[in-house]
Every structure is written in structure tokens, then in C-alpha cells.
């Protein structure tokens, strides 16, 4: 295991002092020079520690007064520490979790993995050496860091999964109603006359949330007596094994262009493609456009998430909206219930809804 940097050691010591009640919400923290002397470290180290605490929304600064611990000072007793580990890119998860925490004498340090298993691993290794009460995690890979997550459970630290879980882990999961959302968007395409409907997944080895979306796609076609066709299922290759963001982007780009090449070679190409998320939908629309295939005139494309990329350019993407805020709130509530030894359900579904825009149209076959 890697040696912990000095600023992280100071950070974790301050977290322990918060947890044990030695520092209370509203308390003024010692100044930079006091902390330098206390921990025998440089000013740069203390500033990095303060930046980390501030980035986790644990402290706030008052001009000409000092730095204070965030939260409501009327709470009594030791504060709970429940870190949130997320890929990043969707701030609603963190803001919602922190809103719940401020009402429950709890602190939520936020760690972003940038969707990289290696960075997620670094955060988990650090947290295993910290005195925390529970962990909420949105995993960025399907099973890559299962050894570390099992370490939390072995230490009797509750783990709550957000959006997607790990196979074999008996931990609560807070996720969107992915199956319902994908089913409804496929039904919308069928109502518009489409029967040749393809599916674009991130990977053949799907996350649990993506498995549910794919299940909704398959079951809806079967329900409407539309045959499933192997050649209509597309995915990128080995995305779960890519270590860097550059490698991920390259793999995505190759996969989208290969999908378009496969499309052009088909005797009976699909008239619509359901994508597992909005980023895939937007990239696929771009790849189709490079080949002279227009959306929605030549092909309909749908997404999932209702992220900013869905409306970033024409055509705006018909998609399934998730309530990221509700998911963040519920995940933190479940973690708090586990800390209090309350019984909780294993799966908590958050409702989804269809957002109709420009990227699909009616056809006649």
C-alpha cells in the first residue's frame, strides 16, 4: 500500500477530531501557523489540507476572522463521517447528500474518481485508514476494487452503492428505475412505427444499472413480438479495463465509428438506436453525421440520463431523465439508517421519466 502524503495525514487527523466531537460545527479552526506547529509540517502541506477540507464542503472561511467547521452548531454529540465517492460530472449527488448531512450531525467528504478505477482505488485505500462511520460509493468500474470494498465490510463499516452495485455484495443500492425508463422509451419508438430498433451499450460486461436498461430493451421488444437481432446490439470493447481518460476516449471513438461502418454494411439497418446514456447518443449522432447519416431524418437515436450533453446541440436528444438529487438524498438517508442499526431495503428505486425532444421521428414501414 502506498505511503500516505503528509497533507492527507493531517486531513484524516482533523476528520477524526470532527468525528470524536473535539471540533464542533461552527468552531473556528486553528490558523495556518498554529497547524504548522501542531503537525510539524510546511505551510504548503496545511494549505493543501485546507483546500481538501474546503473542497469537501467541510469548512468555510470568514474574511478577517478565520476558518470554521461547516454545519449547524446546535447539534450535540459526535458527528458521523460518511464519505461520498463518485465519478464526478454530476454535482447533484454531492449537493443532495450534503444537504441531508447538515440536518443529521454528519459530514460528507466528497471524493471524485474522474471515472478512473486507479484514482478510485487511491481514495478507497486512504479511507480504509480513516475512522469513518459508513461509505456511499458510485463505482466507476464493475468489479475492479472489490478487494478494498470488502475491506470496509470486514471492518463492519456499512457500504451503500449509488446508481450501480457490485455482484456478490449484499449492500443496499440506490438506483434509478432503469428498466422502466428504457422500456418506455422503446415503447415510444414502437408507437412511432419503428420495429428495427438497435441498442448501444458501453460494454459487453455491463454494470448493474446498464443490465437493467438492456433488460428493459429486450423485454419490451419481446412483449411487442419484435425479434431480437444479434447484429443490432453494439458496444465498445474492454472499456472496463481502460486505465486513463485518453484511452477511454479513444476506445469510445473507435467503437462509434465501427458501429456506423457496421450500420452501412447491413442489408436491413436499424431505423432507431437506443443508447445506454446521453454521451453515447451524442457521440453516435456525431459519428453518423460524419458518414452522411442524419438524425432524426435517417435514423432516430435516444439517450438516458437527461444530462447537459442531451441539449448541447442539434438535434436535442430524446432521453430518460434521472433524479440525481433524489438518489443522492436517499443514499445518504440509507447510510444514516445503517449507522443507527435500522433495517433497510436492499434496493431503492428512484422514478424516471421520458423527455421527448428532436432526435426521433415517426416512420412508415
Locations of regions flagged by a protein language model:
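N-terminal helix-turn-helix DNA-binding module of bacterial transcription factors
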Residues: 1-76
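Hydrophobic alpha-helical segments within soluble ligand-binding/sensing domains
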Residues: 172-200, 215-219, 252-261, 322-340
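Short acidic capping loops at alpha-helix termini that bridge into adjacent secondary structure
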Residues: 25-26, 195-196, 228-232, 294-300
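Flexible loop/turn connectors
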Residues: 13, 253, 257-365
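Alpha-helical recognition/docking segments in bacterial nutrient-uptake
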Residues: 2, 12-16, 34, 51, ...
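An alpha-beta-alpha
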Residues: 185-227, 347-359
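Periplasmic-binding protein-like
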Residues: 83-84, 132-139, 160, 198-201, ...
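Short beta-strand elements in bilobed, periplasmic/extracellular small-molecule ligand-binding domains
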Residues: 101-113, 218-248
Amino acid at each position: 500500500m502506498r505511503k500516505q502524503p503528509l497533507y492527507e495525514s493531517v486531513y484524516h487527523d482533523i476528520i477524526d477530531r470532527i468525528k470524536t466531537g473535539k471540533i464542533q460545527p461552527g468552531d473556528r479552526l486553528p490558523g495556518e501557523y498554529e497547524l504548522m506547529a501542531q503537525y510539524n509540517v510546511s505551510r504548503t502541506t496545511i494549505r493543501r489540507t485546507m483546500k481538501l477540507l474546503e473542497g469537501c464542503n467541510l469548512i468555510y472561511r470568514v474574511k478577517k476572522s478565520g476558518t470554521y467547521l461547516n454545519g449547524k452548531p446546535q447539534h450535540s454529540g459526535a458527528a458521523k463521517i460518511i464519505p461520498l465517492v463518485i465519478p464526478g460530472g454530476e454535482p447533484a449527488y454531492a449537493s443532495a447528500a450534503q444537504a441531508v448531512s447538515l440536518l443529521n450531525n454528519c459530514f460528507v467528504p466528497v471524493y471524485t474518481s474522474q471515472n478512473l478505477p486507479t484514482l478510485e482505488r487511491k481514495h478507497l485505500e486512504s479511507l480504509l485508514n480513516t475512522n469513518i462511520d459508513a461509505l456511499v460509493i458510485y463505482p466507476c468500474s464493475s468489479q475492479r476494487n472489490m478487494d478494498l470494498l470488502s475491506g470496509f465490510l470486514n471492518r463492519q463499516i456499512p457500504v451503500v452503492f449509488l446508481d450501480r452495485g457490485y455482484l456478490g455484495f449484499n449492500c443496499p443500492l440506490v438506483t434509478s428505475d432503469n428498466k422502466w425508463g428504457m422500456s418506455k422509451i422503446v415503447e415510444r419508438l414502437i408507437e412511432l412505427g419503428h420495429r428495427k430498433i438497435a441498442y448501444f451499450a458501453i460494454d459487453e460486461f455491463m454494470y448493474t444499472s446498464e443490465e437493467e436498461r438492456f433488460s428493459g430493451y429486450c423485454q419490451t421488444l419481446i412483449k411487442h413480438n419484435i425479434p431480437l437481432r444479434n447484429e443490432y446490439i453494439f458496444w465498445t470493447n474492454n472499456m472496463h479495463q481502460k486505465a486513463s481518460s485518453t484511452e477511454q476516449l479513444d476506445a469510445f471513438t473507435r467503437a462509434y465509428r465501427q458501429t456506423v461502418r457496421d450500420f452501412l454494411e447491413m442489408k436491413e439497418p436499424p431505423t432507431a438506436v437506443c443508447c445506454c446514456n446521453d454521451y453515447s447518443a451524442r457521440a453516435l449522432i456525431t459519428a453518423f453525421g460524419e458518414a452522411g447519416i442524419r438524425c432524426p431524418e435517417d435514423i432516430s437515436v435516444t439517450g438516458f440520463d437527461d444530462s447537459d450533453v442531451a441539449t448541447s446541440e442539434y438535434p436535442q436528444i430524446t432521453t430518460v431523465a434521472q433524479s440525481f438529487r433524489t438518489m443522492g438524498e436517499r443514499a445518504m438517508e440509507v447510510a444514516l439508517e445503517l449507522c443507527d442499526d435500522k433495517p433497510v431495503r436492499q434496493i431503492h428505486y428512484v422514478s424516471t421519466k421520458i423527455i421527448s425532444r428532436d432526435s426521433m421521428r415517426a416512420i412508415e414501414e
